[in-house]
């Protein structure tokens, strides 16, 4: 999972591929990183200290900083919300529908996701991370 995704990012940067992400996903990434770190700390130490909570938030911000160095956010406006609503019949996950809308707005060549349902229903070219790594080799 994660190691393949990291390898994909490394390969994409080496190939100088323009990477994009839905700006709406940054809040999800921030939340996941912070909450995962807090959960890990609780498992290891029994409870969450104030310093650990601050560190988790700082880590999440640092990860967003790295993301902004690797990829460009695709903004979201009312037209993306409209486009997401049109995807509801195919894929009823609103967050994923916003990702589809971002890919369509950016006219992305490829949507990379390990979400099998999203891959199968996306109205844009989509593949999982392992297949996307293989695809990168064809661009050289």
Residue locations for each model-derived region?
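Short, well-structured N-terminal submotif of metal-dependent ribonuclease cores
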Residues: 1-24, 33-41, 137-139
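Residues at the C-termini of beta-strands that transition into short coil/loop
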Residues: 23, 77, 129-133
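Helix-adjacent hinge/juxtasegments
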Residues: 37-71
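Active-site neighborhoods of divalent-metal-dependent phosphate/nucleic-acid chemistry enzymes
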Residues: 68-110, 114-116
